[in-house]
Amino acid sequence: MTDTSTAAAVFDWDSPPPVGGTEHALWLAHWHFQFENPEQLHMLEQLYHDDIVWEVPSRRVIHHGKREVLENYARIFESCAEPKIEPVERYATAQRVFDDLEMTFKLIDSKGFPNHQLPVGTRIAMRVVHNFHIQDGLIIRENGYEIWRPDISW
């Protein structure tokens, strides 16, 4: 049986759980999403393995290495206006974290979302499932599975 856990605890940046356990994997995912913003992008780098691979299969986008991944995140931030994230669920094993969320935003340019499915200017309601692979206590792979829809709630 696989050991899984959901994130109910508040994770302290200065006191990470021991590497190799489910709680450490959840700690990585928690701080990944906390640092996923333009002001703290430099902190995100500390969570990534040097050999990080970032992929969104539905848009056929893949980035290798910290520099490429962080530059891509900077472009994503420039492409979104009024972003809002609503977590759905998160669970983990020691080597994987799955995170399901709803993200709404206005797509203001294409730089951060190559091969996107909806026109620039559209308000987007995107369902995203992240699959984080953990190795040596760091995120070595981040796969994002996106479902793009026009946001009809605006």
Regions of interest found by a model, annotated:
Residues T2-W154:
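C-terminal and inter-domain tail/linker signature
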